[in-house]
């Protein structure tokens, strides 16, 4: 995109100027619609989520044995929801905004196997591929006890095949560790933003890590090229994969069950607001889709991005989706939130979900570090920087009278609200790395 076009874009969409200036912005989409109207544009439905959920249950006996840490949840890869009242009080004081209702944290940061939200989609897509191959050759049928996949026969079978993926870190961790456990040969193409400890962990599991000096887009492209040259290589496409998307979407029905168990009501009088950090969009898009199907129009999903990588906000706001990258408007895509360092959004997710996502906001690296330290000090929970992007969501919603009026949020409905921050990663960060992050937070 040339300079003239950027000038035209700025005139057409004044918010773009603020993005270029790396300002923290918040935009509530006026074109958001009901689930009934928005769902047909997704191209997927509740039945697709049920199929994904059933598949994960089939794999549960295998996962329990392959990864004993999944035993507590009977082989399901799931995380707890916790209240964070001290953090809520700290946010109210710091930003001088009363946050009505309850502030909670969804600890995908502590998901078993790979310690991030990517354990949902990444592991699911590997399992789908493994099941497909094994059923096609008659080694497996859906009625079998899937723990048989641990046998030498299956490992030998999967060794004929390889898997490739491009990643800033967490998706590569999930896909790499799951693929290697099954017996696949796996290559993870990692962008310049990827943390060293993530590369080392993958290598320790026998994963081939290919490093790039460029950003996420280049890593994905190279992974795709590798797969094209080898008929036995399966490429997992973070930008366009409906399978990944469905792996994330199962989180909706699971959260509904958790809320039922906790006695948390979500209905017209008790709205739910969910704040999701966003990179390329697959993880938050899939989770938001699942939440919408589970809770209908009573859940409001809001995406959070770094000021240096606001790709989804830029794509949806301008309507250009994956036809524009942040670099096209002079933004460098360099952020400490490595999992969110994406310059070009998923066109599939942007177009599928734009009518169902209430809003988007950006947050600086400095603020993410500050929130990281605050959460650690107040609640004793340690996350990686990108996982804190969602923490400002309740402040934005509570401070926007315009948005509250549009949603007809009365004082009573606000008081009954649940605000859920989706913590996307950090549970497996090595101690030295976490200490360095905490030092940057000033704590």
UniProtKB/Swiss-Prot annotation:
It is an enzyme of class 4 (lyase). Transmembrane segments: none annotated. Gene3D superfamilies: 3.40.50.1100. One of its GO terms (molecular function) is pyridoxal phosphate binding. GO terms for biological process: D-serine catabolic process; isoleucine biosynthetic process. Keywords: Lyase, Pyridoxal phosphate. This is Probable D-serine dehydratase. SUPFAM superfamilies: Tryptophan synthase beta subunit-like PLP-dependent enzymes. It catalyses: D-serine = pyruvate + NH4(+). PROSITE patterns: DEHYDRATASE_SER_THR. It comes from the Bacteria. Belongs to the serine/threonine dehydratase family. DsdA subfamily. The gene is dsdA. The modification N6-(pyridoxal phosphate)lysine is found at residue 118. Its cofactor is pyridoxal 5'-phosphate. Its EC number is 4.3.1.18. It holds the Pfam family PALP.
């Amino acid at each position: 995109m040339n300079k003239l076009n950027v000038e035209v874009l700025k005139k057409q969409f004044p918010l773009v100027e603020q993005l270029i200036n790396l300002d923290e912005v918040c935009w509530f989409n006026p074109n958001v619609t009901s689930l009934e109207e928005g769902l047909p544009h997704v191209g997927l439905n509740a039945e697709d989520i049920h199929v994904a959920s059933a598949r994960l249950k089939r794999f549960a006996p295998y996962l329990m044995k392959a990864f004993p840490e999944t035993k507590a949840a009977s082989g399901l890869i799931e995380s707890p929801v916790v209240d964070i009242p001290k953090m809520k009080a700290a946010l109210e004081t710091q930003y001088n905004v009363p946050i009505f209702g309850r502030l909670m944290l969804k600890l995908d940061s502590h998901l078993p196997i790979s310690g991030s939200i990517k354990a949902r989609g990444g592991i699911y897509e590997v399992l789908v591929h493994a099941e497909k191959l094994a059923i096609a050759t008659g080694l497996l049928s859906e009625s079998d006890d899937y723990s048989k996949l641990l046998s030498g026969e299956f490992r030998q079978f999967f060794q004929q095949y390889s898997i490739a993926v491009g990643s800033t870190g967490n998706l590569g961790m999930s896909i790499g560790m799951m693929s290697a456990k099954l017996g696949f040969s796996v290559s993870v193409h990692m962008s310049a933003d990827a943390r060293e400890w993530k590369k080392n962990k993958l290598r320790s599991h026998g994963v081939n890590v290919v490093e790039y000096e460029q950003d996420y887009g280049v890593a994905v492209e190279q992974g795709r090229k590798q797969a094209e040259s080898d008929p036995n290589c399966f490429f997992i496409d973070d930008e366009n994969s409906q399978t990944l998307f469905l792996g994330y979407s199962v989180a909706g029905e699971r959260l509904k069950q958790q809320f039922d168990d906790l006695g948390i009501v979500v209905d017209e009088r008790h709205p739910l607001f969910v704040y999701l950090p966003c990179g390329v969009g697959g993880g938050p898009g899939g989770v938001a889709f699942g939440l919408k199907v589970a809770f209908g129009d009573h859940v409001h999903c809001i995406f959070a991005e770094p000021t240096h990588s606001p790709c989804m906000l830029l794509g949806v706001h301008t309507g250009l989706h994956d036809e524009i990258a942040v670099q096209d408007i002079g933004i460098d895509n360099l952020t400490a939130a490595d999992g969110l360092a994406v310059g070009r959004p998923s066109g599939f997710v942007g177009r599928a979900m734009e009518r169902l996502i209430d809003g988007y906001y950006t947050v600086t690296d400095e603020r993410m570090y500050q929130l990281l330290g605050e959460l650690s000090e107040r609640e004793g929970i340690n996350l990686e920087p990108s996982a804190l992007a969602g923490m400002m969501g309740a402040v934005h919603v509570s401070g926007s009278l315009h948005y509250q009026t549009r949603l007809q949020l009365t004082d009573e409905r606000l008081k009954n609200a649940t605000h859920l921050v989706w913590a996307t990663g950090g549970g497996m960060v090595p101690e030295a790395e976490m200490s360095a992050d905490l030092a940057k937070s000033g704590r």
